[in-house]
């Protein structure tokens, strides 16, 4: 199965089971959890079933395109099921069959591994999924997002597409994976991404302007506050956010951008251990403010995705 067909198969599998198939977020994210289709929609009582591919960028993980399985950009396939169904594990195993891997013929293990994202103030009870000694997925029950309890709990499935493709094609290097094969015309993963890995690794480790990134982080932080406290001074005593006026989605966009600026600075070695914790705390505070405002906003709107009776019960 090619990399391209792997994505198409998972999309069809989850679409057939009631998931919306949405598109990747159009900003740099470290994981699919940063996509607002996860971070925001996992909050509050409204049901939400969605699946999407998320190109994920982690600047410090770059290896100039020389490491066979470690990159600064990779792809996750993320599924959010809210509320989490009782048979979520069975659905996951069924999805493995859809991509040509019968769990009965392989050593599939769920190894306890609770998940946490300090910058997002998020955590969940979870398991790594290993097949024949290789980790291919993460399975999580979200407990908190932005420091807010998740009620109901969402089930998250995250497929590591590169690892799965290497496993299915029996390749030792991600760059040898067949991305597409149409009538014998083969395009490999490395044909598309290997040069990009070298360029972005060079940028992240050597060329990123440190002063500009520090300044941009401050701008992002200020924008989040301005967009949430729209029409009020966030520094004023007693200032409060009006959820109906707040621009939650643009504010969250700047949270994501601030997190990426921090990650680039971290890759450049520009942040000390002490500063690192302080910056994580700053991003987490922004994420929490956005999450709280989003929850208040959805309530003020009457929970549009709930039926009328459910909305009244949730109030």
From Swiss-Prot:
The EC number(s) this enzyme carries: 6.1.1.14
Keywords linked to the UniProt accession: Aminoacyl-tRNA synthetase, ATP-binding, Cytoplasm, Ligase, Nucleotide-binding, Protein biosynthesis
HAMAP family: Gly_tRNA_synth_alpha
Similarity field: Belongs to the class-II aminoacyl-tRNA synthetase family.
Quaternary organization: Tetramer of two alpha and two beta subunits.
Enzymatic reactions: tRNA(Gly) + glycine + ATP = glycyl-tRNA(Gly) + AMP + diphosphate
A single GO molecular function term of this UniProt record: ATP binding
Keyword match Cytoplasm: yes
Enzyme class: ligase
Protein name (database record): Glycine--tRNA ligase alpha subunit
């Amino acid at each position: 199965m090619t990399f391209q067909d792997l994505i198409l198969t998972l999309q069809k599998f989850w679409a057939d089971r009631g998931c919306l198939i949405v598109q990747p977020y159009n900003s740099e994210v470290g994981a699919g959890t940063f996509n607002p289709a996860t971070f925001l929609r996992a909050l509050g009582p409204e049901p939400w079933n969605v699946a999407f591919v998320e190109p994920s960028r982690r600047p410090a993980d770059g290896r100039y395109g020389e490491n066979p399985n470690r990159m600064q950009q990779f792809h996750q396939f993320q599924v959010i099921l809210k509320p989490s169904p009782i048979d979520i594990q069975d659905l996951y195993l069924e999805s493995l069959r859809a991509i040509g891997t019968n769990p009965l013929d392989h050593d599939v293990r769920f190894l306890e591994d609770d998940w946490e994202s300090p910058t997002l103030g998020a955590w969940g009870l979870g398991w790594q999924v290993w097949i024949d000694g290789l980790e291919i997925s993460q399975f999580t029950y979200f407990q908190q997002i932005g420091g807010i309890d998740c009620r109901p709990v969402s089930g998250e499935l995250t497929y590591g597409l590169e690892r799965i493709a290497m496993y299915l094609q029996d390749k030792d290097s991600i760059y040898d994976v067949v991305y597409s094969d149409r009538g014998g015309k083969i395009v490999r993963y490395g044909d598309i991404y290997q040069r990009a890995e070298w360029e972005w690794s060079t940028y992240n480790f050597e060329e990123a302007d440190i002063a500009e990134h520090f300044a941009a982080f401050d701008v992002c932080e200020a924008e989040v506050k301005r967009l949430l406290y729209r029409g009020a001074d966030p520094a004023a005593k007693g200032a409060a956010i009006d959820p109906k006026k707040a621009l939650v989605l643009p504010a969250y966009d700047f949270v994501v951008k601030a997190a990426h600026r921090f990650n680039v600075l971290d890759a450049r070695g520009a942040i000390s251990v002490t500063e690192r914790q302080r910056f994580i705390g700053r991003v987490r505070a922004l994420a929490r403010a956005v999450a709280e405002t989003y929850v208040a906003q959805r309530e003020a709107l009457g929970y549009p995705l709930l039926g009328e009776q459910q909305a009244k019960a949730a109030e």
